[in-house]
Amino acid sequence: MRQTYYFLSFVLLLFVFISCSDDVVGKGTDTIGLETKEVFFKSSKDSIELRTRKGDDWWLTEISTKDTIYRTHSLNVQVIEGGGLYVEKTGRKSIFIRIDSNLTGLERRFTTVIQAGNYYYTITIIQKAKE
């Protein structure tokens, strides 16, 4: 009886230790394959199209400025815009970014987040100040 108790306790502890994992949310493997981490624009209105190398099942999550976050709550949204920035998923492997003219005397910074499952990819967008 005592051996059975020890055996069951051992199996239970073994099961608990095996089932625990240290997976961190957002630390998935790169399934997007976008090599560009930073995009630089001059102060005038400008645009760029970026291409992904890997997956095509990603979606736009948010764009943010220093003080505002523009977030989507649907996987089907293809466009996010706000603060003078327009981001669109134009194809299965392409993302289009357009920025309005910077009329301030300060550099503008935006962050765009795209997501594929548990993997998040951040693109930093920097626009020069008006000269």
Segments from the language model and where they lie:
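Positively charged n-region of N-terminal signal peptides that target proteins for export
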Residues: 1-5, 112
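Sec-dependent N-terminal signal peptides
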Residues: 6-11
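Short, solvent-exposed loop/linker segments at the N-terminal edge
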Residues: 39-44
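Surface-exposed binding patches on compact interaction domains or structured appendages
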Residues: 45-96
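C-terminal edge beta-strand
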Residues: 95, 118-131
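A short beta-strand micro-motif common to beta-rich folds, especially ectodomain repeats
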Residues: 104-118
